[in-house]
Amino acid sequence: APQAPSVENPPEADCMLGIGKGYRGKKATTVAGVPCQEWAAQEPHRHGIFTPETNPRAGLEKNYCRNPDGDVNGPWCYTTNPRKLFDYCDIPQCESSFDCGKPKVEPKKCPARVVGGCVATPHSWPWQVSLRRRSREHFCGGTLISPEWVLTAAHCLDSILGPSFYTVILGAHYEMAREASVQEIPVSRLFLEPSRADIALLKLSSPAVITDEVIPACLPSPNYVVADKTVCYITGWGETQGTFGVGRLKEARLPVIENKVCNRYEYLNGRVKSTELCAGDLAGGTDSCQGDSGGPLVCFEKDKYILQGVTSWGLGCARPNKPGVYVRVSTYVPWIEETMRRY
């Protein structure tokens, strides 16, 4: 089951976040409409595990529905029906309110493609996704763009395998992904961009719970072109060629290089399409490498980070005169929005 992070439920709200472990509302009837038994009472049902004494922090007051044991089905209570020990309660999910592209933790923005970048401040890029196969190893990056959708590179996916082979990890800083903030959610559907661009959408089997460590990035306006020399950031756990910080999320700042310049003979020599963008140090030394395929290139605009690129390809890794190439997300916003709306 997906690990539910510890999220603060709004005080007294009659709605729940995630599986409702933090629910402290006043619902006191089961789905069948039967009143709940008081947690402190021993009639009609005798019980010793979940009482206000044994679980003083679980909010077991009166006979309100609660989820003291983190049951995946949500809040429950002992019932006043002598023939039914316990039952679940019908509590709606809270509307998740979040601002896309606004981390709760300020990013380091280290000067220096991720080979020569630096270790990120934990959870400062809260839309960063680690894509895993059944083997559990990180093999590609991705970006959370709404509670139920992740954008990644098409070349990361093997369409023969189908969605059940993939899981996304959210809220991680360490590649091992064992922190309490981690949410692990199976993928339910894969959508490859129809014109065969190197971009794909993953629908999650259940929505991510938006927390301080898990926040979507914003999508750009359709067909927006990032100006030359705009400073943007890439993040990932990828191949770092013996450089420092393996296993922790890394970041690097990169200037965008306009296509006209990037396609010059001495750089990428006409290989970059208008639906792609270049970013990198023409001197070499920083770049996103294998293993960060599918990960984000975000640019700060006004007061938020906007996903402008999906890491796609590069010639080698952090080589002089060979900037990284990213899918230009703005080109595909109509397809992204249409797919999210239809499915």
Swiss-Prot record:
One of its GO terms (molecular function) is serine-type endopeptidase activity. Plasmin is inactivated by alpha-2-antiplasmin immediately after dissociation from the clot. PANTHER family: COMPLEMENT FACTOR I, TRYPSIN-RELATED. It comes from Ovis aries. Residues 1-140 are annotated as: Plasmin heavy chain A. Its EC number is 3.4.21.7. Residues 141-343 are annotated as: Plasmin light chain B. Belongs to the peptidase S1 family. Plasminogen subfamily. It is an enzyme of class 3 (hydrolase). Converted into plasmin by plasminogen activators, both plasminogen and its activator being bound to fibrin. Cannot be activated with streptokinase. The lineage of its organism: Eukaryota, Metazoa, Chordata, Craniata, Vertebrata. It comes from the Eukaryota. The modification Phosphoserine is found at S130, S221. Its main location: secreted. InterPro entries: Kringle (IPR000001), Kringle-like (IPR013806), Kringle_CS (IPR018056), Kringle_sf (IPR038178), Peptidase_S1_PA (IPR009003), Peptidase_S1_PA_chymotrypsin (IPR043504), Peptidase_S1A (IPR001314), Serine_Proteases_S1 (IPR050127). Residues 114-341 form the Peptidase S1 domain. The gene is PLG. It is found in: Secreted. Residues 1-17, 41-120 form the Kringle domain. Transmembrane segments: none annotated. This is Plasminogen. Kringle domains mediate interaction with CSPG4.
